[in-house]
Amino acid sequence: MQSWATDGSVFFLGRSRPPLSPRAMIPAIFLMGPTASGKTELAVRLADALPIDIISVDSLLVYRHFDIGSAKPSLALRQQYPHALVDIREPDEPYSAGLFREDALHCIALARERGRIPLLVGGTGLYFRALECGIDTLPPANPALRQSLMALAETAGWPALHQRLATLDPEAAAGIAPHDRQRIQRALEIILGSGQTISGARHWQGTFPGPLYKIILRPPRSWLHQRITQRFDVMLNEGFLDEIADLSARHYAPELPAMRAVGYRQYFTWHDGLCSAAEAYQAALAATRQLAKRQDTWFKRESAHYYLDPSRDDASSLLLQMATRPRQGEVHSIGWDNG
């Protein structure tokens, strides 16, 4: 079994801080990648080889009842390989990057106290950023400006406001879908209210406790698109349409984040009789591919110690190599061609 160095030789993030206890020096591992890139499969294979506690980093998996369309690990799998921060909120209960950071830090501390490795697995880049760097300090909400944007959206439509956002802040617009009204509204509210781009107005406050290193999955696009289609077909066979009907019967507000999640949003439109099943299927696939593209764009801006191509047959063994030999300040591309 791998024994972890406790002499400070592993990679350290953040400002200098008092010496940590030996167990606090167990490095946390971030396993990050776009949707359908095989993160869960790789995580459980790693858990077969190392004393790992899996902690989910997914803004949709926190919600109960959203199971099939979110590709949530099955209950049977979670009984064998427990996943923290899954099914911890009702869909109408608020959750945020700040709350996630509090919950994740607690889970990391518990894992280290037990002498286990915290493995944080997911695709929600903002949650990873909040956990690593602290909470951002964006300007507060501006109700008057928000009301004005809502009125404009009613006449011009959210895609038009997204185009306006792309003119004012191309970087922010690239990470937001044209129909994601909540994020478009907030982005424009910040930019128009502060006169700054999102990155200019954002200031991160906080540090990560103890050592940390990051592994980013970089799948080939054609392979990922094929997996997205295959996974969606599996979801439909597993009863995704029944899940849509069940969620509709619960009468959740349509503007809730979970209700507007990729895949769900398109099939709620079908359930309401506004499109055909074939149209919903194609729209859901297209939206999922766009989500994967946005996630990949986010992770390309992240620094990491390792990059891994999950399409490789030996991806699990390569991941084990990465997880058992952290290097101070080095970057490796094991099993991934960045050329």
Curated annotation (Swiss-Prot):
- What are the start and end residues of every segment in region (Interaction with substrate tRNA)? 58-61, 182-186
The superkingdom of the source organism is Bacteria
Entry binding sites for substrate: T35, A36, S37, G38, K39, T40
Name the Gene Ontology biological process terms. tRNA modification
- Class in the EC hierarchy, top level: transferase
Q: Which UniProt keywords apply?
A: ATP-binding, Magnesium, Nucleotide-binding, Transferase, tRNA processing
Q: Which Pfam families match?
A: IPPT
**Documented EC number(s):** 2.5.1.75
> Which InterPro entries does the record associate with it?
Dimethylallyltransferase, IPT, P-loop_NTPase
Name the residues that bind ATP: G33, P34, T35, A36, S37, G38, K39, T40
> Which reactions does this protein catalyse?
adenosine(37) in tRNA + dimethylallyl diphosphate = N(6)-dimethylallyladenosine(37) in tRNA + diphosphate
The protein's GO terms of the molecular function aspect are:
ATP binding; tRNA dimethylallyltransferase activity
Site residues, Interaction with substrate tRNA = T124, R146
Q: Which cofactor does it need?
A: Mg(2+)
**What function is annotated for this protein?**
Catalyzes the transfer of a dimethylallyl group onto the adenine at position 37 in tRNAs that read codons beginning with uridine, leading to the formation of N6-(dimethylallyl)adenosine (i(6)A).
Quaternary structure? Answer: Monomer.
Q: Which family does it belong to?
A: Belongs to the IPP transferase family.
Q: What is this protein called?
A: tRNA dimethylallyltransferase
Origin organism is: Acidithiobacillus ferrooxidans (strain ATCC 23270 / DSM 14882 / CIP 104768 / NCIMB 8455) (Ferrobacillus ferrooxidans (strain ATCC 23270))
Q: What is the lineage of its organism?
A: Bacteria, Pseudomonadati, Pseudomonadota, Acidithiobacillia, Acidithiobacillales
From the UniProt record, report the name of the gene that encodes this protein: miaA
